[in-house]
């Protein structure tokens, strides 16, 4: 039986509310001063299986009563063999659920673990209910560091002798031929503190030589924790406010501060054109909240979290900041979390994982480039950082600020409906800086005049001109979301599903499949739209583009930035720094070159194969294409110089391409939201994907169809259909798409599937995951 605390949690979760401090009897306070000692703890065991996705009650040893709180990572005896397992405390109390003599005792606190706050435990519970994950999966998500990391210790040998005693000790050691001891004592003449590493490596000392000197009172060993990662001594000192805000920026700051100072905690959407100075606004909002002693989380997509970006915040806030990114080692990440947990920093900057920073006095969460797909987790729990940030802000009484030049349709619709406060920035921040002039190059017309080059005539001429003037250019390969679709080189149209309006995917060499409804046709030899024989799968790569550009412009200095060239630690920074220092004329890359970078020397951006992402089998393909093209175009003309952009496409008439060329978000939004309403896609409805996986194909088919029949009684269902990769490691996979009006219905759907699974033993072999759009 569950403890009262977990029962109460379940009751609140059923009403789509996270448990509150007043209504849930968890006693989850972090500070131990004056708090009663509990006898029992409810613990989730660190085993990823639904059958143990419940708390187990353990007795708290008297000697650990003051150390264990909600969120503490502990080791406990588990199962018939009482093998030691890791678990997380999710509740505490003084009432035994069954015979106290049968309740096992906590073995100890896990080495190197940090106690997460009660707020994060409640957030994990909310994520469990929202995304259909196990409590163990959500707890692992909110815990600071997955690996058990030890602090890096720095040991120093400190001399305890005065000068006279030191000389006498040297003479005594020389007489007894203690050569190693003599080397160390002589080193103490110049420095009373010798790093242990230096003593062992340079002086060739062993612990056997050091211990007797310590026992005789000649030296002591000082131990300190050494921070891994950034060398704060080399960072720029904070300079305070250095940028004067324009009227639009100041209006956005004033609106936020007015609400903040009156106690209103809202969600704000800063919609600013590329180069409008959203970062300066973020820093002003952060400064206001920090003045009250509050803490701030700033989420930035991993791809944009470059040295250049980080330094902008260090110049303003100094070492109040901790940074997270995937290029940090596990030890470096551990140190950053420890700094946050101890209150040594007030700002955590990083990708979506930074959302779970152990801040107890959170005042503001900012999400830069809130439209980015990187904020959606692709593993369980399949959460979206924007949704989880809203819940964490609610739990902590913090404000939430979203920012983007190309907001997600979900966020912009909420702003239009009054759920978010819209803060527009219509103009570029730098005086005299204007949006670039954009031209669309129709690649169908290029082919008709015999130009089979990857460069249109317009882009070729502009590149030649820029190189002659000593200016820089960026060539962007739009490969985000690339899949093996089929398109016509003559008319530019991709082969789409007649039922779902998404591109068909090429399977093998001769079969086209829709991954939404399962529609299948053989690969045709002629374009169904224009009859042209020039129809085939589409493929492109940055490496081939680099080779072609070097042949076409042999004197140009060229850099390439993609997954291959940035694989090593520091690879991003090295390439971006070289380009910023004018060590190259042309930078070629995928979306990582267009994410928030500011290069004053760039006056031309060429976007190659702009419609690649239009042809992905996803109802969001037009939205993602518009976002990428707009972000890429925004890199040109940022330092007062006029900028040009050339968009090369086989579908110049598409509204996403036209709106991106016009840098007009409202134009795109009006078209796209009508499309979503027409086909009943989010954000005008709620949509979920239920993933079924099983090693027995027949069982998979039967169970997936059984679920679809049951769910069609209460919701619109599409499928089940084979997953894009149907078989992985001998496991077959199918997807069932569900559309409904409210999130509450999705919660009921999970309950219905669980009821089905509990009633039939066939389901024991089927794994189920949920993905909420």
Show where each model-derived region lies.
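Accessory, non-ATPase domains that flank or precede helicase/AAA+ motor cores in DNA-metabolism machines
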Residues: 2-404, 416-430, 706, 737, ...
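Short coil/turn motifs at beta-sheet boundaries
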Residues: 36, 51, 69, 177, ...
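A general secondary-structure signal for short beta-strands and their flanking turns/coil
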Residues: 38-40, 53, 82, 470, ...
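Outer-membrane beta-barrel proteins
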Residues: 112, 678, 724-726
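Inter-lobe coupling/hinge segments of SF2-like helicase ATPases
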Residues: 240-246, 250, 254, 264-701, ...
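Short beta-strand elements
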Residues: 559, 714-723, 764-772
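C-terminal structured "cap/appendage" subdomains that terminate the fold
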Residues: 707-743, 749
């Amino acid at each position: 039986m569950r403890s009262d605390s977990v029962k109460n949690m379940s009751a609140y979760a059923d009403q789509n509310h996270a448990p509150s401090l007043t209504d849930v009897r968890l006693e989850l306070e972090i500070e131990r001063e004056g708090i009663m000692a509990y006898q029992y703890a409810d613990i989730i065991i660190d085993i990823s299986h639904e059958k143990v996705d419940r708390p187990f009650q353990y007795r708290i040893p008297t000697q650990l009563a003051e150390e264990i709180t909600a969120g503490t990572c502990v080791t406990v005896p588990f199962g018939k063999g009482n093998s030691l397992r890791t678990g997380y405390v999710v509740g505490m109390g003084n009432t035994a659920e069954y015979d106290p003599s049968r309740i096992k005792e906590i073995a100890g606190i896990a080495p190197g673990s940090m106690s997460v706050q009660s707020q994060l435990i409640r957030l994990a519970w909310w994520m469990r209910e929202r995304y259909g994950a196990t409590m163990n999966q959500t707890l692992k998500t909110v815990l600071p560091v997955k690996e058990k990391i030890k602090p890096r210790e720095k040991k120093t040998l400190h001399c305890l002798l005065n000068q006279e005693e030191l000389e006498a000790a040297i003479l005594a050691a020389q007489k007894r031929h203690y050569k190693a001891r003599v080397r160390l004592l002589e080193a103490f003449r110049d420095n009373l503190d010798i790093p242990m590493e230096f003593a062992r490596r340079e002086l060739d000392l062993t612990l056997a030589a050091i211990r007797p000197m310590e026992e005789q009172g000649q030296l002591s060993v000082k131990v300190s924790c050494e921070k891994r990662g950034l060398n704060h001594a080399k960072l720029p000192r904070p300079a305070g406010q250095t940028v004067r805000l324009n009227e639009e920026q100041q209006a956005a700051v004033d609106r936020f501060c007015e609400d903040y100072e009156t106690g209103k905690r809202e969600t704000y959407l800063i919609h600013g054109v590329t180069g409008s100075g959203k970062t300066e606004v973020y820093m002003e909002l952060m400064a206001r909240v920090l003045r009250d002693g509050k803490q701030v989380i700033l989420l930035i997509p991993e791809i944009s979290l470059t040295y250049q970006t980080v330094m902008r915040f260090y110049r303003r806030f100094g070492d109040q900041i901790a940074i997270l990114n995937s290029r940090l080692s596990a030890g470096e990440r551990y140190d950053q979390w420890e700094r946050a947990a101890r209150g040594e920093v007030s700002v955590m900057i990083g990708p979506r994982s930074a959302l779970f920073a152990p801040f107890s006095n959170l005042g503001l969460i900012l999400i830069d480039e809130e439209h980015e797909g990187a904020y959606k987790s692709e593993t369980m729990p399949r959460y979206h950082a924007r949704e989880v940030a809203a819940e964490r802000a609610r739990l902590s009484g913090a404000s939430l600020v979203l920012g983007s030049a190309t907001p997600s349709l979900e966020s912009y619709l909420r702003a239009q409906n009054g759920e978010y406060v819209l803060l527009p920035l219509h103009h570029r921040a730098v005086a005299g800086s204007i949006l670039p002039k954009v031209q669309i190059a129709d690649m169908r017309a290029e082919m008709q005049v015999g130009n089979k080059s990857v460069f249109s005539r317009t882009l070729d001429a502009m590149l030649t001109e820029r190189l002659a003037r000593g200016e820089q250019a960026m060539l962007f390969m739009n490969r985000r979301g690339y899949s093996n679709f089929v398109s016509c080189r003559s008319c530019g149209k991709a082969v789409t599903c007649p039922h779902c309006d998404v591109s068909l995917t090429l399977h093998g060499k001769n079969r086209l499949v829709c991954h939404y409804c399962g529609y299948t046709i053989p690969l045709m030899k002629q374009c169904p739209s224009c009859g042209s024989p020039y129809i085939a799968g589409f493929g492109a790569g940055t490496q081939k583009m680099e080779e072609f550009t070097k042949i076409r412009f042999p004197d140009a200095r060229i850099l390439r930035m993609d997954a291959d060239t940035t694989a090593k630690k520091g690879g991003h920074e090295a390439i971006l720094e070289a380009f910023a220092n004018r060590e190259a004329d042309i930078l070629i890359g995928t979306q990582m070159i267009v994410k928030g970078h500011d290069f004053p020397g760039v006056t031309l951006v060429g976007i190659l194969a702009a419609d690649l992402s239009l042809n992905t089998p996803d109802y969001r393909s037009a939205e993602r294409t518009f976002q990428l093209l707009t972000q890429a175009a925004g890199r040109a003309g940022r330092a007062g110089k006029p900028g040009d952009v050339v968009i090369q496409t086989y579908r110049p008439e598409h509204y996403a391409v036209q709106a991106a060329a016009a840098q007009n978000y409202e134009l795109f939004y009006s078209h796209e939201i009508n499309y979503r309403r027409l086909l009943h896609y989010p954000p005008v409805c709620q949509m979920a994907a239920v993933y079924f996986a099983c090693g027995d194909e027949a069982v998979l088919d039967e169970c997936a169809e059984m679920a679809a029949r049951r769910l069609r009684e209460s919701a619109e269902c599409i499928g089940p259909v084979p997953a894009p990769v149907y078989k992985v490691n001998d496991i077959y996979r199918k997807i069932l798409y569900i559309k409904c009006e409210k999130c509450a219905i999705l919660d009921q759907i999970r309950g219905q599937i669980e009821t089905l699974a509990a009633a039939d033993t066939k389901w024991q072999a089927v794994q189920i995951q949920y993905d909420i759009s």
